[in-house]
Amino acid sequence: MIFKDYDFLQNYDLKNFEEKVKIYKELLSKFNRIHNLTHLKNIDENIFDSIKILDFYDFSKAKNIADIGSGAGFPVVFLAFLLQSNFHLFEPNPKKAAFLRTLKIECELPNLHIYKEKVQEYKNTFKADIITSRALMDVKPLLEICKNLKDENTVFILWKGSEIYQELENIKDYEIFENNLRRYCILK
């Protein structure tokens, strides 16, 4: 994938990003053979899906970003390759958390913090400026389990499908951006 062709990425260090993406792909291939972390077929397409949000939302003021159910790192690992924010990844699955820790070391990402626990069990010392999640659960339960990380200024950015419209019933103050079948939902 040629990232330099995308206007929304022009202000980022794409050489460094592409080096980290290469490391990511190698590690994922290695871990997937043993631990079956993900069934995704088109990794490049999912990487693009992870960073396309930068075309719709400005992350520059976010100091702390929490990701719920980080799995194999989509979407926030790729944002962490580009942004200086502190990324807090909550992944209770030991194999997936081990993969994320290895990735942090191999890609030299001091801004990545991995928690091998459910977010609702975390005794936090920070409030997230942004909370992200990719297709983990419906919106309302997600808002509930994240209550210990959020305050009145926290923004939720969710990678969802077309079902998002039903999930947002009785919820106000949101925006949805569409890219093919993906719905990027920003809840304020």
Swiss-Prot record:
It is found in: Cytoplasm. GO terms for cellular component: cytosol. It catalyses: guanosine(527) in 16S rRNA + S-adenosyl-L-methionine = N(7)-methylguanosine(527) in 16S rRNA + S-adenosyl-L-homocysteine. Its EC number is 2.1.1.170. Pfam families: GidB. It is an enzyme of class 2 (transferase). The keyword Transmembrane does not apply. The keyword ATP-binding does not apply. Keywords: Cytoplasm, Methyltransferase, rRNA processing, S-adenosyl-L-methionine, Transferase. Its main location: cytoplasm. S-adenosyl-L-methionine binds at G69, F74, V119, Q120, R134. GO terms for molecular function: rRNA (guanine-N7-)-methyltransferase activity. PANTHER family: S-ADENOSYL-L-METHIONINE-DEPENDENT METHYLTRANSFERASES SUPERFAMILY PROTEIN. Specifically methylates the N7 position of guanine in position 527 of 16S rRNA. Belongs to the methyltransferase superfamily. RNA methyltransferase RsmG family. This is Ribosomal RNA small subunit methyltransferase G. It comes from Campylobacter jejuni subsp. jejuni serotype O:2 (strain ATCC 700819 / NCTC 11168).
